[in-house]
Structures are given as structure tokens and as C-alpha cells.
Amino acid sequence: FKPLLFKAFTLADRAVRTILLKILPKVAERLTKYEIQDKIYPNLVTGFLDTDITVRTETLLSISYIMDKISDRQLNNDLLRYLAKLQADTNPKLRANTVVCLTRISEKMQPTTCIGVLITAFGKALKDPDYVTRLCAIRGFESSIDYFSPEICCSKVLSSLSPALLDKSSVIR
């Protein structure tokens, strides 16, 4: 079963990749860290660059199922680069899901990386034209507030959040 799964992840066929991404939650628990890191992850992240929105979305959603098994380098370098690109995606739902994904993986990030990444990502999301993405950023700050010292909260977090008090959407205010 495993060799076939690893081979299938190397295929470029979108239909196959989408199905693999949808079943990943069921098979990820049966795979070792090594298998995720070396056989699945390198092929999985190519889905972030796909032109099809379904593949990009399924790739993003699958990250939460493998985040415990990918290496620190894969999480803190490679994955964060892909997520930064997704924040500029044309699809608002994908941008919102990117913020949610960042919030989820923040507990696995290196502390030195986490603070800067979250402030930058949530700050950018708060300027997004889509109110759902802005709301996800506010909830992301709320969920990760323990990562920030009082000094950082006052100097960076509040300065990112304060324009939301004047947001045109009442949900955001």
C-alpha cells in the first residue's frame, strides 16, 4: 500500500492529487515521520503552486494532518514561504484558510520565528479586502496572544489591530 501511495503523490494528475489530499487524514496516522518528511511532503507542497484552486485548497487543508510529522526546517522555512505566497492568492476563501492554517501551526513553529511571522501575516490579513480574512486575523491574534510579550502586544499587536476598530464591517469592529 505505501509504495503505491508514495508513487501516486509524484503524479501530476490533478484528479489523483485531489483524491490523495482528501484521503491524507486517514492515512497520515499510519505513516512514520520519515515517510511524511521524505516521501509525502516534498510532493504535497507542489500543490501550493498549482493553478487549480481545488488543489491549492486541499493542499492547504491537508497541512494540519501532517504538521506533527514534518521537520522543523520544512515547517519553519519551506511551508512558511508557501503560506506567505498564498496570502496573496486571488481567492478570498484560500487567503482566510491560510490565516487559519498559520494559527494552527504556530504552536509548532520555533519561538523566534513565530512572533514575527504571526504579526506580519495577521497584520497583512487585517488589510485584506475580504472581511472573513480580516476576521480570521483577529481570531488568530486572539488564539496566539500567549506568544507575545506585553511589550510586543503594545508595540506591534495593538498597532496592527487598532485600524480594525474603524473597519467598515460591523463584524470586524
Specify the residue positions occupied by each region the protein language model found.
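Core solenoid repeat modules with strong leucine/isoleucine-rich periodicity
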Residues: 1-26, 30-32, 37-38, 43, ...
